Amino acid sequence: MSLLKRIAPQLIALALLVALVTVFYPGFLKLDLSGGRLVGPMIDVLKRGAPVALLAVGMTLVIATRGIDLSVGTTMAICGAVAAWAVAGGWGLVPALLLALAAGALAGLWNGLLVAVVGIQPFVATLILMTMGRGIAQLITEGRILTFNHAGFAFLGSGTLLGLPVPAWLWLACGLGMAALMRRTALGLLVEAIGINRRASALAGVNATVLLIAVYVVSGLCAALAGIVVTADIRGADANNAGLWLELDAILAVVIGGNSLLGGRFSIIASLLGALIIQTIDTGILLAGFPSEYNLVIKAGLVLVILVLQSPRIAGEWRLWRDSHRASREARAAQRSRT
């Protein structure tokens, strides 16, 4: 299946959603150039959608192995706290970033060992870190919002590069780079093999344990990068709210992308489109002026419609109707030609 055909439902859903938002807020597609940077609601979608898009990259790989990572939100909080603590302590930008990424990799390694070596169910294994992770972040920040004043670090969250927000470049580079790595090498097939049948893949010579651990480490690194972006944007680490419930949006982005929670075949590009759909819904509801208490209800309703339209059964019924309609039309044309 070609990439364009694979992501066609997500592209159509995104286009329809943008059209719907434009009805309520006509200036949604408007772009202006101010101070060398593009500004507008769509640019805001690209920037604000960065955390969920980054989380969705790692979550796609985890779900492809028939797993789940509920700890990505708290990993964001931990890594953001580590980065802010290091920068505020005078470590410098590069050491602070490396320390935050190392914390994310360590969190992923912890999850991977529990799942692949100890044999704990992914839901339970990652729930452990989800439960205690925010407490770890609060210990690092000493229960307060840890602020810093470092222009280089803040650039990662609120800076502009070639007219676009830096966070947008980060999730595009991460997502497209990982997608290319998975499809241009055998890694993608190996990940899918584990998700389809881990035991069979091991018997075929795949080191399923090491690869499974690596997938969770990648998820931790993606969460660390998301935590860095959020922390840099607000110039501070908020252990209580950073990444709060974003693991659910990340899972939803993967599902909207048409990836099965039962593992197997996956598409990172489709998951990125799923993240854009979620952020477009959030931004559209805000700009349309709906009362805040209706936001979650409207969001849930729109997501439900998108998922129903993308469901295999609906797609099958549509293809059946299309084929029967085409056959009927051809039969009528043939009958007219004979007469």
Cite the ranges covered by each PLM segment.
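Transmembrane helix-bundle core of multi-pass membrane transporters
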Residues: 32, 118, 122-184, 211-214, ...
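Membrane-interfacial amphipathic/re-entrant helices at transmembrane-helix boundaries
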Residues: 1-54, 90-95, 335-339
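Helix-loop-helix "hairpin" substructures at the membrane interface of multi-pass membrane proteins
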Residues: 92-100, 106-111, 115, 163-238
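Short loop segments and helix-boundary regions at transmembrane helix junctions
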Residues: 1-5, 63-68, 88, 105-148, ...
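Cytosolic-side transmembrane-helix boundaries in multi-pass membrane proteins
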Residues: 1-23, 177, 196, 203-210, ...
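Inter-helical junctions in multi-pass inner-membrane proteins, predominant
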Residues: 27-44, 137-140, 160, 182-183, ...
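Single transmembrane alpha-helix segments in multi-pass membrane proteins
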Residues: 21-22, 26, 38-89, 113-120, ...
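Transmembrane alpha-helical segments in multi-pass inner-membrane proteins
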Residues: 223, 234, 238-300
